[in-house]
Structure formats: structure tokens, C-alpha cells
Amino acid sequence: MSFDQFAPFMTLGRPDAVCDECSRPVAPNSISDDDAAVNTTETDTQHANIPEEQDVINIKLDSTFNAESSAETIDLKVEGVKLAIVSQQPTYEAITAETTSSVATSEEASSDTATSLTNLTSREPSPSSSSASSVAEECPSEEPASDDTVPAASEKNHPDGTLNPNYHDARADEVHPQHEVVQVQAPHLPPPQGVQPAATENPDHDSLFSVFTQDHNPLLSGTIVGAPADYVASTPGKKIRDKAASALNIWLQVSPDDLNQIRTVIDMLHNASLILDDVEDGSVSRRGRPATHMIFGMPQAINSAGYQINRAMMEVLKLGSQDCLEIFIEELDRLYIGQGYDLFWTFNIKRPSVEKYISMVDYKTGSLFNMLVRFMAAKTGAKGGVETDNNKAPIAPPDLTRLVVLLGRYFQIRDDYMNLTSDEYTLQKGFCDDLDEGKFSLTLVHALENSPEAEKSILRHLLTQRLSSNGQGMSLAQKHLVIDIVKGAGSLEYTVTALRKIGMEIVNELDQIEGVTGIENKELRRLVEVLRV
């Protein structure tokens, strides 16, 4: 325990000398004439700035700690004033100041000193003050007096005139009416190391830590975790799935509330997939703006995407359909599997077959289209079927599974093709951004299958060099070389032909569904026409 904090209350003078027997400070008039002469020379040199007439009071502090009561007793031994402080956190109390006859200064100086220590705060005298203040530490003499006789406690000085350490003035035990018990407010002092505090603590101390046990701490909103998803949702997009929902509802006739709820779920999942796709592909831009993780950081972007997926499932519960919850889980599982294959081929530079590539597209891109139409069909079934314009009797909802699978394939293959050839895509994502990512598009898969061996080798080396570019992807010259190779292999024409074939199948499906329902779907036909290459 440090007593430096009490220094302003205890610095009443300067020490002049110590006892040869016990090393205690002694008053000036207790010292022999010869010693006084020496001490006067030394102390005057060290304290030349202290006035000669200043009275000197010597202080000694002793501290003891009671582990059972968690109380600390501080004895202040002052030549002229005796003060005992008992600390029971956080108040130091039970103080009795008594003047003794061993004071080397004048009676007035002793009285002033006692007053300065006791008048911090006045209290009524305590019955226990006499016993608390009468504790005095005895100083045993290590050697007997020179005449082999130990002076009695009632004798003040040794025969040689020095102070007797065993001297005790009986008047010190008397309780004087002018002595008061004072309350000294002191800083909180922790118990010594290894000693546990008492079970009953100060109420203020308990309230300081009440935050750790209270039940009503502030609630945290989803604003921060949702900010990255809100950002990607604000970027301009094609809204293909949203438009498809409106077009398909011409046949399925889902209620406006349910349709809006389904759109919300699909949009949340789509935005989450865009965030994760940009992180996993290493894309730095999306729709002409910085990718989400380039603004919010990769950890926060990933966390926000996971949060959106969880929130989407909560929105599914609002549809009130167990079938919809099962659809959500099944199609989300397919989405993860498809993305896993895409990442595996990219990381290992392993070219898939065309058949496996199409299966990957059905899982990765087609899952959200399939989830959309399955949600709508589930909510249509709750109403008993679809009503036609000519016949109000409900009929079974049409099977749109093949139609949405073809839509998913067309959308993904077209998107990859446009990334290699479209000036609009170049402005939004950069020139041939998919080559920086190393993605195996249908065009690249065809080129690696049908190019001469020399060109195949060059393509494989370019994809390998991409991994050693410190995340910079391919250079502009490398990208132009890839385009030249795929053109030479006829891969761009092959991709356009595949898109036209898929487009024709979509139109055939439209014709069949319109024939079954008797409802022409002009809105869906316009959407297909907009996507035509």
C-alpha cells in the first residue's frame, strides 16, 4: 500500500535525527549537545529554505490488514500526535488524536498539529475511540544502557540524556474531551493480493458492475449487418427474376400479398448470392460500381450475405406454408452445390464437359428460377387452382418446371457470352472480367475441347499464369490472345447457336402452356425477346 496520497495531510515538518537504539525519529531537544551540533549543520544545509522558527513534527505510518473483516488499520505515529485510521472500504474511520507529553515542540504547536489532522470532518466522540487510539508500537532496545540498567517506562531519558524508547506517558491513555473522532474520506484501496473482499460491498460499487447481470441492455438493430446487402440491392440490375414473376403470375394467379412476399425472398437470396459470388470470384466491380466487399471489407460482406439468407428464410415462414419452407431448403442446397462445382473447376483449372457445365448452370442459376415458380405453384394450390378468362372454374396449375430450367440456362450462357463480347458489359465490369476470374464459360469449355493442341496449351498456360498475377488477373494483351483463340476455334459462334436453340425451346414451351391454360402470355414473350442475342 502506498501512503504517498496522504502526504499533503502529513507533511508537517522535516526530520532532524533518529534514535541510535531503534532508528526512530526523535525530537530536537532529545539529542545530545554534540549530536545536535552535527545534525544542525547537516539539516540546515539540506533545508536552508525552511524558516528556523518552524516547528518540526515527525511522522511514522504502520499498516495492518484484517483478512476476516477486509479492514485495514493505519497507525500514524506522530511525535506529539497519535492518530489511528481504520479502513472499511471505502471510508477510513474511528480516528482519535491524542497529544502526549513527549512532544519536543511547544504546547501550542502540538495543539495546532492535532487540530489540523482532526478537523477534516467533525463527528461526535465515539466510545471506542479510546481503545482504538491507544494502540502504540513498542520499540525494543537492541542493547542495554551503558550502565547495564534498562530505564523504566516512566523515565523519559537514558542516563546519557538520549530519549528512552520504552518511555510511556500515562497521560496518553487518558481521553480528553477536546479530542474528537473524525471521518476521513479516502480513495478506494483494494485488499492485498490473495485476499478476497467481504461479501457485503458498497452499493455504489455494486451498481458499477450491475450492467453484467441486468436483463435489459440495449438491443442491437440489423442496420450495420444489413448495410452491404442494401448497397448491392441499390445497384442497377436487369431484374430478370422480378419480371419473370410478374409474367408467370398471368398463369398462376398468386395473390398480390403472397407474390410480393415471394419476390422479397428471391431478391434477398439473389443479392446475397451476388455478394458471395464477387468475393469468391475475386471481382472488384459489380454493375459498374465497386463490388460490395471492396467497400465494406470482405468479412463484413460475407457476414451480411449470411444474414440475408437467414432473413430470407424468416420471410418464407410468413408465407405460412410448410411446403414453401421445404422448397427453400431444397433449392438453396442446389444453389450451393452448383456454386461449389464452379469454384472447384476454377481453382483447379479443370475443364468440365459441356454436359457437366449445363448441370452446374441448372443448380447454380436455375435454382432461384425454380424456387420462384415452385413457391408460386404452392400458393396457387392453396386456392384450388387457376382460373381462366373464359371459364371461371379452377384448373390445375400448369407445370412450368421445364420452362424455368430453360430460362435459367439461357440467362447464364447469355451472361457469360456478353462478358466476352459486349461493350456494355465492358463499361460495367471491365473488359472480359470473367477471364480475370478464370471462370469456365461455355465458350471457353468449347475452345479447350476444339482448338488445336498448340492453342489448347496456350489457353491452359494463360489460365495458370492468372493465378500467379497477385490477384491482378490477365493483362489486356493476354485477354486479346484468348479472344483470338476462341474465335479461331469457332467457340463464339457455337455459343450463339446454343442460345438460339434454347430460345426456340422456350418459345415452344410458351406455346404449349398457352394452349393448356388458354391464356396468352405476351409479357413473358417480350422478356424472352429482350434477352435474344
Swiss-Prot record:
SUPFAM superfamilies for the chain: Terpenoid synthases
Composition bias type Low complexity, residue spans: 98-138
Enzyme Commission code: 2.5.1.-, 2.5.1.1, 2.5.1.29, 2.5.1.10
UniProt: isopentenyl diphosphate binding residues: K238, R241, H270, R287
PROSITE patterns: POLYPRENYL_SYNTHASE_1, POLYPRENYL_SYNTHASE_2
Cofactor binding comment, as recorded: Binds 3 Mg(2+) ions per subunit.
Gene Ontology biological process terms, A to Z: alcohol biosynthetic process; antibiotic biosynthetic process; isoprenoid biosynthetic process; mycotoxin biosynthetic process
Binding site for Mg(2+) 3: D415
Protein keywords: Antibiotic biosynthesis, Isoprene biosynthesis, Magnesium, Metal-binding, Transferase
Catalytic activity: isopentenyl diphosphate + dimethylallyl diphosphate = (2E)-geranyl diphosphate + diphosphate; isopentenyl diphosphate + (2E)-geranyl diphosphate = (2E,6E)-farnesyl diphosphate + diphosphate; isopentenyl diphosphate + (2E,6E)-farnesyl diphosphate = (2E,6E,10E)-geranylgeranyl diphosphate + diphosphate
Positions of Mg(2+) 1 binding: D277, D281
Protein residues bound to dimethylallyl diphosphate: R286, K364, T365, Q412, N419, K429, K439
Enzyme class: transferase
Required cofactor(s): Mg(2+)
Region (Disordered): 98-169, 187-206
One Pfam family, short name: polyprenyl_synt
GO MF, one example: geranylgeranyl diphosphate synthase activity
Pathway the protein acts in: Antibiotic biosynthesis
Record function comment: Geranylgeranyl diphosphate synthase; part of the gene cluster that mediates the biosynthesis of sordarin and hypoxysordarin, glycoside antibiotics with a unique tetracyclic diterpene aglycone structure. First, the geranylgeranyl diphosphate synthase sdnC constructs GGDP from farnesyl diphosphate and isopentenyl diphosphate. The diterpene cyclase sdnA then catalyzes the cyclization of GGDP to afford cycloaraneosene.
Name of this protein: Geranylgeranyl diphosphate synthase sdnC
Gene: sdnC
